[in-house]
């Protein structure tokens, strides 16, 4: 069960990734985690990546693909894996294909921009404990105060409307073309493509995923 999750930041991919990992016993492969592990282990690719990062440059797709190929040969990927946040661009998707990284299912979480802005913009955090509230979906008992301590809640910089819209802009420009790419791959019989309404309740989406993937 090799799965790619697609969807804008705040579309609920992280929540469902956890469900899929638990249900199918597969690891989530994050490029950030892979990079850190390879650098720590001092693998040839890790050393190469460290050199690039130390020079303040961006890691090339070649290095990332190399890390993905290395990672999916490990024992915990025997039953499959889950990719979230990669590939982000068409060249990365092409490189994966050229390197023989096969994917069984691509799942898109479809959520309108305005819903994401409301979802993320409504988050409030208690800095001391990390407790997260939402002004609409999970409001504190007293507005802008933590339930346990009564201390002020804050809006994280990542959740301001301006930042959220900027991230959505990057997503539409870079990652949205992957929707067409993988739909074409599915039409050619190379993978299965599933588009889910990401505004449904978490449990409803999990149930749908379970039915789709079997």
Curated annotation (Swiss-Prot):
Q: Which family does it belong to?
A: Belongs to the adenylate kinase family.
Q: Which NCBIfam families does the entry mention? A: adk, PRK00279.1-1, PRK00279.1-2, PRK00279.1-3
Q: Which organism is it from?
A: Pseudoalteromonas translucida (strain TAC 125)
Designated name of the protein: Adenylate kinase
User: Which CDD domains does this one have?
Assistant: ADK
Q: Which InterPro entries does the UniProt record give?
A: Adenyl_kin_sub, Adenylat/UMP-CMP_kin, Adenylat_kinase_CS, Adenylate_kinase_lid-dom, P-loop_NTPase
- Identify the keywords attached in UniProt to this record, alphabetized: ATP-binding, Cytoplasm, Kinase, Nucleotide biosynthesis, Nucleotide-binding, Transferase
What does the comment on domains in this protein's record state? Consists of three domains, a large central CORE domain and two small peripheral domains, NMPbind and LID, which undergo movements during catalysis. The LID domain closes over the site of phosphoryl transfer upon ATP binding. Assembling and dissambling the active center during each catalytic cycle provides an effective means to prevent ATP hydrolysis.
Q: Which reaction does it catalyse?
A: AMP + ATP = 2 ADP
